[in-house]
């Protein structure tokens, strides 16, 4: 398991200390890399944006600057992926021990071993010059309908070998969210663009389009652009549009409770729980409420009842007459 780092560990793993400096006197290279990944994953869940960015910078330094292999980029990608699997397996000690053994082997940077684990985790080998043309031009973070904050999103893009990415926000983007995304991308060497998705009436229906401003030299230039008066006015209008959409989604939730849930319960002969608005908003978290969130939440609350109903029907089928089975 992992949690907040201790004060002593914060001092030892100071981002201002170079991996080839005094850190080499404190502990082993493997331990520092493992700690860097755990520190980042812990901050992804509980830390603020500055903590996440600091943890990402420390991880980048440990993975790339202290690597003792010419295969450092691919080695780093595999190591982070293995550590993510270790965290996910926290309830299975045997699996964790096997993964720790794999982590220890990969830290050697042996190209044959690294390629083996790239294949295991379905990751493509990338050139060590890091000049591949890999793109993903429409992804979302936790500020819209995604589940990953900006730092987590960039880290996963780097693991997959993506160098060019467009992160799309609905109607507006908060400067703090843009700052974290741009700084995380700068740390990991990912070329990121921010897109704004708008919906507009067209021939009696809505169409969506994405506007991705370009031509900025660094993150501060884009943030200055967001602070300009016309952009501030546009973002305020975007917030109003998002509030309208939230009300529309919540009205649909009430319609589900009043009409569709009882009808589905009668048809499927299972209890269909009502959706609590407060619980639904807590499920959405920092994102913007959407019909995708509502569909996922309704499915989540309904799934266990569907599974129980299927099991009951399977048990009944074992003893039922042929007429009943048909």
Indicate where each model-derived feature is located.
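Non-catalytic, alpha-helical, charged scaffold/linker segments
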Residues: 3-6, 15, 20, 24, ...
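An N-terminally biased module of ancient metal coordination in phosphate/nucleic-acid-related enzymes
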Residues: 1-206, 213-219, 224-226, 326
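Noncatalytic linker/hinge segments flanking ATPase motor cores
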Residues: 173-182, 209, 235-239, 252-255
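Hydrophobic, aliphatic-enriched repeat segments that assemble into extended interaction scaffolds
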Residues: 186, 191-213, 242-260, 289-291
């Amino acid at each position: 398991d992992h949690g907040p780092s201790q004060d002593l560990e914060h001092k030892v793993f100071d981002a201002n200390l170079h991996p080839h400096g005094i850190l080499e006197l404190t502990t082993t290279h493997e331990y520092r890399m493992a700690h860097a990944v755990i520190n980042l994953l812990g901050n992804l869940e509980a830390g603020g944006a500055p903590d996440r960015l600091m943890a990402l910078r420390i991880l980048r330094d440990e993975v790339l600057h202290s690597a003792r292999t010419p295969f450092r980029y691919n080695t780093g990608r595999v190591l982070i992926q293995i550590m993510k699997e270790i965290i996910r397996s926290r309830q299975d000690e045997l699996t964790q021990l096997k993964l720790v053994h794999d982590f220890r082997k990969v830290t050697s940077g042996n190209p044959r071993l690294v390629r083996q684990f790239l294949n295991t985790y379905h990751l493509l080998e990338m050139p060590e010059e890091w000049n591949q043309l890999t793109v993903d031009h429409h992804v979302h973070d936790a500020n819209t309908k995604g589940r990953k904050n900006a730092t987590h999103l960039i880290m996963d893009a780097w693991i997959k070998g993506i160098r060019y990415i467009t992160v799309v926000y609905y109607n507006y983007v908060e400067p703090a969210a843009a700052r974290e995304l741009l700084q995380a991308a700068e740390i990991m060497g990912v070329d990121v663009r921010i897109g704004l998705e708008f919906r507009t009436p067209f021939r009696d229906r809505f169409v969506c389009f994405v506007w991705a401003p370009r031509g900025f030299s660094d993150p501060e230039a884009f943030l200055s652009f967001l602070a300009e008066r016309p952009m501030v006015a546009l973002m305020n209008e975007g917030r109003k549009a998002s509030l309208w959409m939230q009300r529309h989604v919540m009205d649909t939730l009430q319609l589900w409770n009043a009409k569709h849930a009882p009808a589905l319960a009668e048809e499927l002969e299972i209890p269909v729980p009502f959706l609590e608005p407060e619980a639904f908003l807590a499920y959405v978290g920092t994102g913007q409420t959407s019909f995708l969130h509502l569909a996922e939440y309704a499915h989540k609350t309904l799934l266990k009842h569907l599974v129980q109903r299927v099991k009951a029907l399977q048990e009944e089928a074992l003893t039922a007459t042929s007429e009943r089975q048909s």
